[in-house]
């Protein structure tokens, strides 16, 4: 099965003008933890408001989520300019991939594959392109989308982490989909 699905390795997430702090990923499982900001006591230090959820939102934006449903859409343009590119560097199989996306043209991402730039007019076309890279030998067969795969690994905090199958916002009535679980 490992030969039918290309390995995905995240390398780094950043913005073109360094508006947010770059996140570098390491091989294996990566956990985003907040740095404790209350140094007055060792016990009970607070990690609220240090950017854990927004880091996940930026990562999800890089993975081509629906911009309108994202918390990134709510950031004032004075804080995060609409033209600022969010850049995600990753490897799919043996190929270096860079995904560039900004809020002004959120539905028109750019994917750089081994130095060659591919621009998309529709978000869905870019998603299908990435799905084809992840499942190169399963073309034409029913496979989960790469967005489906990542919903398991990068869970929405509104899923309440209570059910391994329900990895989406529990306030939405989304039917259970086991396909991504079966591929992992």
Positions of predicted regions on the chain:
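Extreme N-terminal "head/tail" segments of very large remodeling/mechanoenzyme assemblies
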Residues: 1-95
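A general boundary/transition motif marking the beginning of the first structured unit of a protein
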Residues: 47, 118, 138, 168-170
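Short, charged, low-complexity patches
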Residues: 48-56, 119, 123, 174
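Alpha-helical scaffold elements adjacent to nucleotide-binding pockets in ATP/GTP-utilizing enzyme cores
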Residues: 55-58, 100, 125, 129, ...
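Gly/Lys-enriched N-terminal cap/neck module of very large, oligomeric protein machines
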Residues: 87-113
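Glycine-rich phosphate-binding loops of NTPases
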Residues: 104-159
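Extended, Lys/Glu-rich alpha-helical coiled-coil stalks
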Residues: 141-184
